[in-house]
């Protein structure tokens, strides 16, 4: 055999070997493709669930008598397994129990919840949370669902040129300029900006009502948080913008006590305090009057009053000393009494701080209810209210992602690049790390990051807050870093102070240091220090995964439970004021006062509260249930095939709660961004309104703990590629030079190229290998898993590649799936991680195998049993069936595939079949992308698939009596119930058709009074038609198949099935259909080349090759050039060459006596068949005395294969040509030469002969093997006709759509067509008796069944509507009869209706009667999604 060096043999499994034509070899093992779902839910169950539940505890009663503490959480195993939940329509869920301890603080008595009598578990049953299955889905009410990941804007700080604040009523306040947007996960959005033509920095924030956006100075906010003017100027080194901001505001000692409208309250308190101080004759009296005055009015003013009284007293003390020392010079007096002056200055600064806090609280409408509850502690203040609003995680949360973003934006190390520093950077030992006047480079930045992280640089300072700000005891972060840089790198004459956040902050709330650093960032922008953010950059977006969505939902439920517990504790405490308690995670509410224990009788003590009596868990249960049943991001899993299921779980949506609407026309949101590289696939997205809003993760992308999408790269040091791999976020990408994976490397992995193409900050350029920091892993990391399964995608137009990616997800699993001969190497990974394959959990040896289960003895001598799924219905009604691919005695390894699922072959994805295709026209049948197929594809079940429909019926308890499952239904023909057994249930194996009864059921009618003689006759003849009505389950319109299984679920079953109270029994009937390929079915390749089957041609009439091989499919060659998907042509030639080589190697292996094992690994065939095949081929070689493959005739091989049940579909070497790194032109030429295909003369094309005439076609034709798929859009689901059927109650027109047995809409333009042809009678019928002429259609139906002529003389409902509208305009409408009489239209209509109702011979269709009886008013006349194909057949 010829051995080319441009490929390697890649052993994928024992039965699969592929020729790998990739040029870039990598041992990198990508992440598990389901990791995004599984790891997220694991994090929720192991960490988040306990955090959220325990977060509301301990809770204390208002009087301090009771304390409810959290002691533990128990997560139990589900009571039913997955399959039982699926069969019974239950939820696969895990029960949650919490251990709570109620302590009576007066008596010391401790109570806990007693053991649950029903479950035998200790603790309080909180509820049940659906458990994720191993393949990343949830079973909810028997249906598999999953959570789609939502891409949202990340909390953090953003620098923008334009921003807006949304107000109520869809209003917005727009701002332009240099804006710093502080965007929290929960809390008030704030914008810091410098107005045009001014230098003072302002803050804009939306008030709590949402009606307006309030503006105030940044220094006002800093003062409100406890900074003085002097401290602010010191931090910012007297910057001009800060000075102007201080000058604009009125919060200074000069203005604070002036009699103005802004300071009215301060002035009044100051005047009152002065009066009280002067009136008091002694100190005790002064204190008493002071306390009385402070306690009056709002509790939040008490702190302000207290400070003003202190100020007045301190001022009087200084004035008294001044009077005593009036001979002393002022300067000396102040020097001698500096402490007194400092104390007074601190007091006045505290007053300013409290006044600023008060103004902001009132301006923003901050809720002060929680703060007022602290009046007993003397802690209530506006300072506390403001800090609670911004520094309490329950009210203001930036999340871990927000903290990460704050640090990335505000650290000094992120802002000094390419700036000249104006001060030395000194370490703690006073060594100069970087001298002044140095231009900061990348190397300097890395040094600064390291030393700053280790706290080794002497530029860290602490913000000094006023005592009033520290009294709140709320955790703060006050460290910042600062350094001066030159405003202009060249002139170096003026400096500006850069103030940054110090590293190490772990708080997930806003901090004073954050505000200080943000203020610096705003004015630094004037000197081009810092950079504006691109809001569409992926570094500014993050994913909300299942753990975050569930955490938020459970936090809501726990907040409601907390409120309920507080109310109960307040009542049990005997507290009359019923104060809402706030736990110690928000405001410390521990009351330091003693309350006497109330006298309780012995009877009352027995009825004392228990743990169960003060907690109500219904909120938890209802919110969790509501989340999994109705949340926008919970969707049915697409189980069309393994690729569809896997792609579903890796999908990203920008829509959903708080997301983007599909009607939003913004193209920037939908467009591909450079930061998507290796993170989000630029190809795979839906067509239509959702384009760009629904995306897919790239094939190697993961999600980090903060929700940012990260991509892997190899580390490069000094031009050498290391084995170390790092995952980088999109923002980290921008800081490094990242080369493409296609660079040339030597054996030591040193980059050989003098210049390499690399990316830096969104731009591509040439760089030296020593400048490169990272290198891509493999080229395919750019695209999603679906796109990476398309060979030669680099040769396809983007729009066609998009269609190819989407249509692979629509491929229907076939009964004989074959993996593609021309693959990309990702087929195994996709099938393995999809969750549909059977994967070994441990190393071991196979002990037992059959069609139902696999038993493996692991290395610990324990048996692992794997039950195989057999013919289970999927969400898309396809057949989910698993087949073992191991044998007894085989050694298997952990994570090895041991069983194939649907659309798999030997562990590889197998969505379709390798088909011999010719690009030629044939009698016009493949016009406009139509596809001509050979009858072989029908006869040999090449594209045959199995579909399973589930039909369910419930036997209910009704107010008139119980329903009954029976074979004896009234008014049902024997033909319709011929397949029922004695109990009235269809027999398994019966071939049923439309209208056949599957389960017989009767429902009692209401009380119907009958004469005694009628009841006697009913008893004698067994006539039940008057007492019960037929409500059987029948085969729906247009359906047929074979009954595969019947499941009966009763509430009295031994397995303990739990059914609703009014349900006696549920019966499920599964009908299987075997669908062969037929005219009208949709087929497609992997390159976006799709079409509808237009003709099935007999094998003998199909064009054939020179050796007599007939084509399987003929495609229109005009479908290639304009679509620019040339990848299909490369696949065509490569596939044909691989198939030809397979035929050669089939013989060569036997000639070389390499053994039958080579057949197994090369062709993936069964061991027994491989032995027989090897034996027969060996005998054939001996008989023919062959020395080389060409000595054996093709017909002899065909006969041998047919004897063993094989075909050429089973013989062919497999190729792996990864996307962007696969077989090139030279490789294809080499492999075609190896297959003895004439390239020089025929360019790989073939002479085709007409099967009808035997003559050769003019010109050479491209023929080869293409991987074709049968899509879910099948004609059996779409074709539909209606004779009689249901009508809409409102319009009296036929319903629309196949699902409602509706008709075909005849619209305005269709009417024009009939008018153009003059087809008056056809038009009359269509607009009257076939539409909404009730009387006319009944008469027509009557006439047809009696064989009379049809006369349509009724009045359509639409004409009646027209007359009513004309009457509404004040017009008189009359009808003129034959005898010239004028009748009012209303009278005429009534007469017509009376005639219609009196007609005894009117015969109604059964379906119409049923709709009227059951009063099922159908208003929706839209088509069902499955009734038409919404895609263009281009």
UniProtKB/Swiss-Prot annotation:
The keyword Transcription appears for this protein: yes
Organism's domain of life? Bacteria
The biological processes this protein is annotated with in GO are:
DNA-templated transcription
Q: Which cellular component terms (GO) are annotated to the entry?
A: DNA-directed RNA polymerase complex
Q: Keyword set for this entry?
A: DNA-directed RNA polymerase, Nucleotidyltransferase, Transcription, Transferase
Is Transferase included in the keywords of this UniProt record? yes
The reaction(s) this protein catalyses: RNA(n) + a ribonucleoside 5'-triphosphate = RNA(n+1) + diphosphate
EC nos: 2.7.7.6
Q: Which GO terms describe its molecular function?
A: DNA binding; DNA-directed RNA polymerase activity; ribonucleoside binding
Q: Which HAMAP family does the record associate with it?
A: RNApol_bact_RpoB (MF_01321)
Q: Which NCBIfam families match?
A: PRK00405.1
Q: What is the stated purpose of this protein? A: DNA-dependent RNA polymerase catalyzes the transcription of DNA into RNA using the four ribonucleoside triphosphates as substrates.
Name assigned to this protein:
DNA-directed RNA polymerase subunit beta
């Amino acid at each position: 055999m010829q051995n080319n060096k441009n490929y390697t043999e890649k052993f994928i499994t024992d039965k699969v070997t592929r020729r790998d034509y990739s040029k870039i070899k990598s041992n990198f093992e990508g992440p598990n493709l389901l990791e995004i779902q599984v790891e997220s839910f694991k994090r929720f169950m192991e960490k988040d669930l306990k955090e959220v539940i325990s977060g509301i505890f301990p809770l204390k009663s208002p009087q301090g008598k009771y304390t409810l503490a959290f002691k533990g959480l128990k997560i139990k195993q589900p009571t039913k397994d997955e399959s039982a939940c699926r069969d019974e329509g239950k939820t696969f869920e895990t029960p949650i129990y919490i251990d709570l301890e109620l302590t009576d603080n007066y008596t010391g008595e401790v109570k806990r919840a007693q053991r649950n009598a029903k479950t035998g578990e200790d603790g309080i049953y909180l509820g049940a949370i659906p458990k994720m299955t191993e393949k990343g889905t949830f079973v909810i009410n028997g249906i598999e669902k999953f959570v789609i990941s939502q891409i949202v804007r990340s909390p953090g700080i953003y620098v923008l040129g334009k921003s807006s604040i949304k107000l109520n009523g869809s209003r917005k306040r727009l701002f332009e300029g240099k804006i710093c947007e502080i965007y929290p996960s929960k809390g008030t959005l704030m914008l810091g900006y410098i107005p045009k033509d001014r230098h003072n920095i302002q803050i804009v924030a939306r008030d709590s009502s949402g009606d307006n956006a309030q503006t105030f100075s940044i220094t006002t906010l800093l003062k409100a948080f406890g900074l003085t003017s002097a401290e602010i100027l010191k931090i910012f080194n007297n910057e001009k913008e800060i000075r102007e901001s201080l000058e604009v505001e009125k919060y200074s000692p000069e203005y604070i006590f002036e009699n103005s409208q802004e300071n009215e309250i301060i002035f009044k308190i100051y005047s009152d305090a002065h009066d009280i101080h002067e009136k008091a004759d002694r100190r005790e009296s002064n204190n008493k009057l002071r306390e009385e005055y402070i306690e009056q009015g709002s509790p939040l003013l008490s702190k302000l009053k207290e400070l003003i009284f202190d100020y007045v007293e301190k001022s009087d003390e200084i004035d008294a000393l001044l009077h005593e020392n009036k001979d002393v010079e002022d300067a000396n007096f102040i020097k001698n009494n500096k402490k007194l002056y400092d104390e007074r200055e601190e007091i006045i600064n505290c007053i300013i701080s409290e006044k600023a806090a008060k103004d902001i609280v009132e301006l923003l409408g901050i809720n002060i209810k929680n703060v007022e509850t602290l009046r007993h502690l003397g802690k209530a203040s506006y300072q506390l209210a403001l800090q609670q609003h911004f520094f309490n995680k329950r009210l203001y949360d930036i999340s871990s992602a927000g903290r990460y973003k704050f640090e990335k934006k505000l650290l000094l190390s992120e802002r000094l690049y390419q700036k000249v520093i104006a001060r030395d950077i000194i370490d703690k030992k006073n060594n100069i790390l970087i001298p002044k006047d140095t231009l900061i480079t990348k190397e300097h930045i890395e040094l600064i990051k390291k030393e700053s992280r280790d706290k080794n640089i002497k530029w860290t300072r602490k913000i000094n807050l006023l005592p009033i700000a520290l009294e709140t005891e709320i955790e703060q972060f006050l460290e910042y870093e600062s350094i001066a840089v030159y405003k202009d790198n060249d002139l170096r004459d003026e400096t500006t102070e850069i103030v940054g956040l110090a590293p190490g902050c772990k708080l997930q709330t806003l901090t004073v240091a954050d505000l200080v650093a943000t203020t610096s960032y705003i004015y630094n922008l004037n000197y081009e220090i810092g950079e504006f953010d691109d809001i569409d950059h992926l570094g500014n977006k993050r994913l909300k995964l299942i753990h975050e969505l569930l955490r938020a939902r459970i936090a809501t439920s726990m907040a409601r439970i907390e409120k309920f517990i507080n109310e109960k504790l307040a009542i049990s405490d005997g507290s009359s004021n019923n104060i809402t308690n706030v736990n110690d995670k928000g405001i410390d509410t521990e009351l330091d006062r003693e309350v006497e224990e109330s006298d309780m009788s012995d009877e009352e003590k027995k009825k004392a509260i228990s743990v169960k009596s003060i907690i109500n868990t219904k909120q938890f249960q209802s919110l969790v249930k509501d989340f999994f049943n109705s949340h926008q991001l919970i969707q049915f899993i697409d189980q069309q095939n393994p690729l569809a299921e896997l792609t579903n779980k890796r999908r990203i949506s920008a829509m959903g709660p708080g997301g983007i609407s599909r009607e939003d026309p913004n193209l920037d949101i939908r467009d591909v961004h450079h930061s998507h590289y290796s993170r989000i696939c630029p190809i795979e997205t839906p067509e239509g309104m959702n384009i760009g809003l629904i995306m897919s993760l790239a094939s190697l992308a993961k999600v980090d703990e903060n929700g940012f999408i990260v991509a892997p790269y190899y580390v490069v040091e000094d031009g050498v590629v290391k084995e170390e791999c790092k995952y980088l976020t999109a923002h980290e990408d921008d800081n490094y030079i990242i080369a493409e994976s296609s660079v040339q490397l030597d054996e030591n992995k040193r980059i050989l190229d003098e210049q390499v193409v690399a990316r830096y900050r969104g731009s591509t350029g040439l760089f030296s290998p020593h400048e490169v920091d990272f290198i891509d892993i493999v080229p395919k990391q750019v695209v999603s898993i679906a796109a990476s399964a398309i060979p030669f995608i680099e040769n396809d137009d983007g729009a066609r590649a998009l269609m190819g990616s989407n249509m692979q997800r629509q491929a229907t699993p076939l009964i004989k799936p074959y993996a593609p001969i021309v693959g990309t190497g990702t087929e195994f990974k996709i099938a393995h991680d999809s969750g549909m394959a059977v994967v070994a959990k441990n190393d071991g040896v196979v002990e037992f195998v059959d069609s139902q289960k696999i038993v493996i003895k692991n290395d610990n001598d324990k048996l692992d049993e794997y039950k195989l799924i057999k013919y289970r219905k999927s969400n898309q009604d396809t057949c989910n069936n698993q087949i073992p691919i191991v044998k007894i005695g085989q050694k298997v390894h952990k994570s090895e595939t041991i069983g194939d699922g649907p659309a798999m072959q030997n562990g590889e994805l197998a969505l379709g079949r390798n088909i011999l295709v010719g690009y030629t026209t044939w009698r016009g049948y493949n016009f406009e992308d139509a596809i001509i197929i050979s009858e072989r594809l029908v006869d040999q079940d090449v594209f045959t698939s199995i579909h399973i429909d589930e039909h369910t019926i419930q036997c209910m308890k009704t107010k008139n009596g119980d329903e009954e499952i029976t074979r004896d239904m009234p008014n049902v023909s024997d033909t319709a119930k011929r397949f029922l057994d004695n109990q009235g249930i269809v027999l398994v194996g019966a071939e049923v058709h439309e209208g056949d009864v599957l389960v017989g059921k009767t429902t009692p009618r209401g009380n119907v009074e009958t004469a005694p003689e009628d009841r006697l006759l009913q008893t004698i003849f067994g006539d039940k038609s008057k007492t019960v009505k037929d409500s059987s389950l029948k085969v729906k319109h247009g359906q047929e198949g074979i009954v595969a299984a019947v499941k009966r679920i009763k509430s009295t079953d031994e397995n303990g099935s739990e059914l609703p109270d009014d349900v006696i029994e549920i019966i499920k009937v599964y009908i299987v259909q075997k669908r062969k390929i037929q005219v009208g079915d949709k087929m497609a390749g992997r390159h976006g080349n799709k079409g509808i089957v237009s003709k099935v041609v007999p094998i003998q009439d199909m064009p054939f090759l020179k050796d007599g091989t007939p084509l399987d499919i003929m495609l229109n060659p005009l479908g290639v050039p304009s679509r620019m998907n040339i990848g299909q042509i490369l696949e065509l030639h490569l596939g044909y060459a691989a198939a030809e080589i397979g035929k050669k190697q089939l013989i060569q292996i036997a000639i070389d006596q390499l053994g039958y094992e080579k057949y197994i690994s090369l062709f993936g065939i069964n061991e027994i068949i491989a032995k027989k095949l090897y034996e027969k081929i060996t005998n054939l070689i001996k008989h023919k005395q062959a020395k080389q493959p060409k000595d054996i005739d093709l017909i002899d091989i065909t006969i041998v294969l047919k004897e063993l049940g094989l075909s050429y579909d089973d013989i062919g070497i497999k190729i792996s040509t990864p996307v962007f790194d696969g077989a090139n032109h030279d490789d294809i030429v080499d492999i075609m030469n190896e297959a003895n295909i004439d390239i020089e003369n025929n360019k790989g094309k073939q002479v085709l002969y007409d099967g009808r005439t035997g003559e050769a076609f003019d010109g050479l034709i491209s023929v080869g093997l293409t991987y074709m798929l049968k899509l879910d859009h099948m004609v059996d689901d779409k074709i539909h006709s209606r004779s009689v059927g249901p009508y809409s109650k409102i319009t009296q027109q036929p319903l629309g759509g196949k699902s409602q047995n509706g008709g075909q809409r005849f619209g305005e333009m269709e009417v024009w067509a009939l008018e153009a042809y003059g087809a008056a009678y056809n038009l009359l019928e269509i607009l009257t008796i076939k539409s909404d002429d009730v009387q006319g259609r009944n008469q027509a139906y009557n006439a047809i069944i009696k064989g009379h002529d049809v006369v349509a003389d009724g009045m359509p409902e639409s004409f009646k509507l027209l007359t009513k509208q004309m009457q509404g305009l004040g017009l008189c409408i009359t009808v003129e009869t034959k005898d010239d009489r004028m009748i009012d239209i209303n009278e005429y209509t009534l007469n017509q209706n009376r005639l219609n109702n009196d007609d005894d011979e009117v015969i109604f269709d059964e379906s119409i009667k049923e709709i009227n009886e059951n009063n099922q008013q159908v208003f929706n006349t839209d088509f069902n999604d499955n009734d038409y194909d919404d895609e263009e057949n281009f």
